Structures are given as C-alpha cells and as structure tokens.
Amino acid sequence: MSDSTASSINKGLAAADPAIAALIEKEQQRQETHLELIASENFASRAVMDAQGSVLTNKYAEGLPSKRYYGGCEHVDAIEELAIERAKELFGAAWANVQPHSGAQANFAVFLALLQPGDTIMGLDLSHGGHLTHGSPVNVSGKWFNVVQYGVDRETQRLDMEAIRQLALEHKPKLIVCGFSAYPRTIDFAAFRAIADEVGAFLLADMAHIAGLVAAGVHPSPVPHCDVVTTTTHKTLRGPRGGLILCRDADFAKKFDKAVFPGSQGGPLEHVIAAKAVAFGEALQPAFKTYSQHVVANAAALAERLIARGIDVVSGGTDNHVVLLDLRSVGMTGKVADLLVSDVHITANKNTVPFDPESPFVTSGLRLGTAALTTRGFDAGAFREVADVIADRLLNPEDDAVQQQCLRRVEALCQRFPLYAAARQPALA
C-alpha cells in the first residue's frame, strides 16, 4: 500500500471530506433543534449507528449464512445468524430473513415468491392510509398485478371488515395485504385471516409502522395469523433503515429466501444487518416495552389535545403512534399546514385523508407520529404542549407574534429533552 493510500483511508471524515462533514453536522443540529413528528421516523441508538458505521461496510457476502459465494464470511455469518435468531425471538416467528434493504424490497420479494404477473391482489387504498407497495398504480405492485383496493368507512373512518370480505368474495384475490402507512387504529389480523381463508388467498401483513408496538406487545401481532409478515426495521422499532421478512411456516422459507437472493437483491448489507441485530437486542429488553407503551399513550394525549383545540383527527383518535389531522375542520390544506409547522421547527408531513377532495400534492391532512419524540423522553404532558404549539400556529397563520412565540416554545422543549446529549457524533472527528 502506498503512503498516500494508507494516509487516505486513515483520515476521519472531517479531514477527508469537510463538505460532507459540515452537512452532517448541520443535519445533526437540525435534529437536535426541531421537533420530529414524522410518523415513519425515529432516533436510532448510538450502538445501532456504531454497528452500521463499522468495518462490516467492507464485506461482501452473497448468499445465506454458511451458504456464501465468497470467502471470509465466518464473522458476518455469526452476525447474520444472531440477527435472525433475535428477530424470531422478538416476533415469535419460525423463520426470518434479515437481508431486505427496505420494507418495499421485502414486499417485492413476497410478491415475487407467491404471485405471477396478472394475479389479483387486495390492499388498502393509498389515500385511505395504505402504502405505495400495496397496489398503487405508480408502483410495480400496481403495474404487475390486478389490484382491488379496499378503503375505510366514510362515517367511522375505520376499516369495514364486512365490506372488505364482500370485495374479496367478488374478486377472489390470490393475496390480501393488511397494513398501512397512515391508519391510526388497531388492525384485526384474525378477521383478515378469516377472509383470506374463505377466498383461498395468501395473507401478507405489512407491519412496518407498528413493528415496535407489536414487538412490545402493545399491538396485536400479525405473525400467528398471516402467511408472511414484512416490516421495516426503523420507525417504531427504532433500528437502522432496512427491511425484514417473517413467517410461521417453514414450507414458505425457501421461497422467500430465493426471492430475496438471487430473485431481487445481490449482496446483503452486513453492516446494516449488524445494526438490525443490535436494534432487535434492544427491543428484547424490558425498557423497550415501557417505551412503546409511552409511544401509544403520548399519541392519545396529542390527539385529545388537538381535538380539544378544534382540529379534527381522522377516526376520532388513535390506537397506535399515528395521529392524522383532517384540516378541513379549520379550512386549511395539508400543504399549507406542513409549511406553517415547519417554520416553527416542527417536522411533519402533509397527507391525504379518507375521501380527500385535494390532490396528493396538496392534501387535506397532516400526519403526526410520536415515536421519535418519545425516544427523546417526551411524556404525555410534553405532547400536550406540542399539540398547543401546533394548534396555535395553525389557528393563527398570519400572526407573526404567535409564530415567534411558538418558535421559543419549541426551542425550550428541545433544550428540556436533548438528543444525543452526551457528545457530538464521533464520525466527525
């Protein structure tokens, strides 16, 4: 190795690439000084980030543990096996594949394993809280398959299981997807199982948003009821950004393994798999159950206070971490609301609501989630303060004095509940 090469690989980020180091520093400052209410985001532990930023980044490992196409895999084999065993223990599954790079990749692998192009699938309409990968026409799931979308009841804004059953009886899907990206109520997986059995369909649960709540036992588990379960490993699970597939029947295992590799991916990201293993280990600890209980209680407190302030919440409340505001109650679009809360350092996202008259680029809703701020230590009282800041900003959009007051209150909350307070990120040294 030349002196110049040795020197270059031993430089820290700040010395090697000050432009990227500075931008990472700015992002850390943003996370520390803003209230993160995007429902799909959370704050991973330092241990998770240390694993992901390790020398495992260097290792290629196509295949499965003990069945690799490359040498030198003895240590990544042990890491991946540990991740698999922890995932199985955490969710009570018979089998797990920890290699999917994302939840979308996990869903695609399931489709590849169980379906043929042109088969019929059923999934929750995106505008009613579903996900792009559940049959949206802009996603491969909507291009390859005949999609029948179910929705929520117009009055209750909850899933109508009898209406879903009638759709299934009419269309005889080969696969039914139950899962969501913006549905604030408990999913009845047993009822979906009964419908799937009645029409002879496979049942896929996408629990990406509620995986941490399921792991902690504060939301019913889909694993006993579904042929296959997919999830991301971040969101409420608080791990690295990645995917996971679980199932209860070993007969399906080989199909799903092959659908991941070589069917839809090449080499796994072993540094991310190590970070997943760390996150699964954290979720197996008693403290994670307490955390998840607080996530749900905090969401209820947030929803109740916003309703009391005159802002409608879809379905009238929440059973999980998601609070979806229907801003038609205050004559505002989601796009405008997103901008208003952003300028007081609250991060959320505009979102469609059921039967939304606005386009997906405008929307009538604002989606909030409690996982990230609960990680920072926010309790129900703090979330009521957050709700008041949001309400004050949305109900007084033209008042500069209110805007400045909201900024000061957000700053005080951030100082009261610091993020990564012990030290700056070591990667920047």
From Swiss-Prot:
Site feature: Plays an important role in substrate specificity: H234
Matching InterPro entries: PyrdxlP-dep_Trfase, PyrdxlP-dep_Trfase_major, PyrdxlP-dep_Trfase_small, Ser_HO-MeTrfase, Ser_HO-MeTrfase-like, Ser_HO-MeTrfase_PLP_BS, SHMT-like_dom
Residues reported to bind (6S)-5,6,7,8-tetrahydrofolate: L126, G130, H131, L132, S359, P360, F361
Primary subcellular site in the record, as a coarse category: cytoplasm
Chain's role: Catalyzes the reversible interconversion of serine and glycine with tetrahydrofolate (THF) serving as the one-carbon carrier. This reaction serves as the major source of one-carbon groups required for the biosynthesis of purines, thymidylate, methionine, and other important biomolecules. Also exhibits THF-independent aldolase activity toward beta-hydroxyamino acids, producing glycine and aldehydes, via a retro-aldol mechanism.
Localization: Cytoplasm
GO molecular function: glycine hydroxymethyltransferase activity; pyridoxal phosphate binding
Pathway field: One-carbon metabolism; tetrahydrofolate interconversion; Amino-acid biosynthesis; glycine biosynthesis; glycine from L-serine: step 1/1
Cofactor(s) required, per the database record: pyridoxal 5'-phosphate
EC numbers: 2.1.2.1
Pfam families: SHMT
CDD domains noted in UniProt: SHMT (cd00378)
Catalysed reactions, semicolon-separated: (6R)-5,10-methylene-5,6,7,8-tetrahydrofolate + glycine + H2O = (6S)-5,6,7,8-tetrahydrofolate + L-serine
Broad EC category: transferase
Name of the protein in question: Serine hydroxymethyltransferase
GO CC annotations, alphabetized: cytosol
Species of origin: Parasynechococcus marenigrum (strain WH8102)
Gene encoding the protein: glyA
GO biological process: one example: glycine biosynthetic process from serine
Family stated for the protein in its record: Belongs to the SHMT family.
PANTHER family per the UniProt record, alphabetical: SERINE HYDROXYMETHYLTRANSFERASE, SERINE HYDROXYMETHYLTRANSFERASE 1
Known partners and oligomeric status: Homodimer.
Keywords annotated in UniProt: Amino-acid biosynthesis, Cytoplasm, One-carbon metabolism, Pyridoxal phosphate, Transferase
N6-(pyridoxal phosphate)lysine: residues carrying this PTM: K235
